[in-house]
Amino acid sequence: MAKKPSLSPEEMRREALETALSTIERKYGLGAVMKLSDEAHVAIPVIPTGSIGLDLALGVGGVPRGRVTEIYGPESSGKTTLTLHIIAEAQKRGGTAAFIDAEHALDVAYARRLGVNTEELLISQPDFGEQALDIADMLVRSAAVDLVVIDSVAALIPQAELEGSMGDTQVGGQARLMSHALRKLTGTIHKSRTAVIFINQIRMKIGTMGYGSPETTTGGNALKFYSSVRMDIRKIQTLKDKEEVYGSRTRVKIVKNKVAPPFREALFDILYGTGISRTGEIIDLGSDAGIIDKSGSWFAFGSERLGQGKENVRALLEENAPLREAIEAKLIEHLGMTPTKFASSGEEPANDEENDL
């Protein structure tokens, strides 16, 4: 009987690692462990975010279906604006979206300006946290809703706290509520392929004494653990025309990603009244990629001069849709953003190359 050739120590280590990785994937699913340089990501259906840069940073072309996503940041950082764009993208693809407005603060006119079909949007304004999460659970279980947004975790107040006296303390009530709800929701979300987005706020920790970040999110630790994607959104610059403020430069950092390598960032402009400026992104990303030639403050696309200054070019491209679409198509091709599968809620994703992006 021929002897099995002996393996070198390096080959034995590599074989042991491959065995461990395959065991982890069998137990916890594809994507539980990956290299930061991996290009082959988990093939799952997604809902685009409305931002080219953010879709690229997420690694799969948008917010994953059948998963929990958390979007958090300081006040007025663009959290609700981003989720309204995601709702609009879902509706464009024939999907059904629900917005659970626990804060009772949704601006319907603003949502409409961002492209949301408010007549088809399911809206709930629950009285307490248990009601909000129960409604979310029933919508997910129906397998007929593609996207559920809960705005926000901080407003999910337990019923016992609302019915108690003003001075009563309910220590950990919200954290227990979130932990119980997410244990119940997670399996159903995966089966129905519904994308569930929780909007969250930031609070300051007490007594950190300079060690670690002083910031934390509300609702305990359960949402951190159950989320497949966590996005930190921040306003980093105010956009002004002389003295008039017309928007903000916004950065989104992917602080957790179980479907692609994390820690990537996206930058885009949020313009007051109109939301994320896709045209602005085309200019920025196109210039970085060399598709748009930038010489000083002048911009050109091939032999065609676009204008001087980003705002002038933005105005030109907003008016000239064919030119904007030509630049965008070339940019998407350059970035290698492959077509994504949307897939209706409850539908198994097909293994084809259908272009729903």
UniProtKB/Swiss-Prot annotation:
Q: Name one GO biological process term.
A: DNA repair
Which SUPFAM superfamilies did the record assign?
A: P-loop containing nucleoside triphosphate hydrolases, RecA protein, C-terminal domain
The record's annotation in InterPro entries points to: AAA+_ATPase, DNA_recomb/repair_RecA, DNA_recomb/repair_RecA_CS, P-loop_NTPase, RecA-like_C, RecA-like_N, RecA_ATP-bd, RecA_C_sf
Per the record, GO CC terms? cytosol
Listed binding positions for ATP are G73, P74, E75, S76, S77, G78, K79, T80
> Superkingdom, according to UniProt?
Bacteria
One Pfam entry for this protein is RecA_C
Please indicate if the UniProt record lists Phosphoprotein as a keyword.
no
* Gene Ontology MF term list: ATP binding; ATP hydrolysis activity; ATP-dependent DNA damage sensor activity; damaged DNA binding; single-stranded DNA binding
Which keywords label this protein? ATP-binding, Cytoplasm, DNA damage, DNA recombination, DNA repair, DNA-binding, Nucleotide-binding, SOS response
Keyword ATP-binding listed? The answer is yes
Q: Where in the cell is it found?
A: Cytoplasm
- Which function does this protein serve? Can catalyze the hydrolysis of ATP in the presence of single-stranded DNA, the ATP-dependent uptake of single-stranded DNA by duplex DNA, and the ATP-dependent hybridization of homologous single-stranded DNAs. It interacts with LexA causing its activation and leading to its autocatalytic cleavage.
Q: Which family does it belong to?
A: Belongs to the RecA family.
- Protein's name according to its UniProt entry: Protein RecA
Organism annotation = Nitratidesulfovibrio vulgaris (strain ATCC 29579 / DSM 644 / CCUG 34227 / NCIMB 8303 / VKM B-1760 / Hildenborough) (Desulfovibrio vulgaris)
Ranked from the top, the taxonomy reads: Bacteria, Pseudomonadati, Thermodesulfobacteriota, Desulfovibrionia, Desulfovibrionales
